[in-house]
Regions:
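Helical (often loop-to-helix) elements that flank the catalytic cores of nucleotide-handling enzymes
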Residues: 1-20, 103-119
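Metal-dependent DNA replication initiation modules
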Residues: 6-60
Length: 193
């Protein structure tokens, strides 16, 4: 349902920089190296309604935000929300939009399987009346910037530990976090590749 979708979207925001770091592959702009692993996001983030979304405490709050933008002629429909992740405007799903285009079919399958596993794990936690820690958009953007600049070769902030951690280590921790839902999803092989 849409209420579950907004809850999963809120929680999944934390993992966006992790998966983004795995997908970075746009280091050039106008034929020149930029020093970023993904410069595409630096360009795209200049547009409105992009980047990591705010936290919404309910689907009603999310819908009211969309209605206000439509009513005030900012957008003509919810498809004009270009966040890195959003509740799809026509389906009861969470849509992830942060990644650079993967270079291979296998990379595409792996990233899709990771997003699926994150959603399944967050759904499982919610079904057990548990929640994943919520962090502010400002903090999440720190990790997004690091992921865009350094990809998996840098470090990001582990907000729970309040320290910098190698991005690869955080990705391994993400894999451990979703491990128990992989058998049911049948996606272990896709992720292990």
């Amino acid at each position: 349902n849409r209420e579950m979708a907004i809850h999963i979207a809120n929680s999944a925001r934390y993992f966006l920089p992790h998966i983004f770091a795995l997908s970075t592959n746009s280091p050039f702009w106008e034929g020149r190296t930029t020093g970023y692993k993904s410069f595409r996001t630096k360009v795209f983030d200049k547009f409105p309604r992009t980047g990591i979304p705010d936290y919404f405490d309910s689907i009603e709050a999310y819908d009211n935000y969309i209605k206000l933008l439509v009513k005030t002629n900012c957008i003509d429909n919810a498809k004009k929300i270009w966040w890195d992740l959003r509740v799809h405007p026509f389906f009861n799903t969470v849509e992830f939009r942060i990644c650079d285009v993967p270079m291979t079919v296998q990379e595409t399958i792996t990233i899709a399987a990771l997003f699926q596993a994150i959603c399944a794990k967050l759904y499982k936690l919610r079904s057990q009346n548990l929640n994943f820690m919520m962090y502010s958009r400002a903090l999440l953007n720190e990790n997004k910037w690091r992921a865009g600049r350094y990809g998996i070769d840098g470090s990001m902030i582990d907000f729970g530990k309040e320290m910098e951690v190698n991005t690869r280590v955080l990705i391994y921790e993400l894999l451990d976090f979703v491990d128990d839902v992989l058998p049911e999803l049948g996606s272990r092989h896709a992720i292990n590749n």
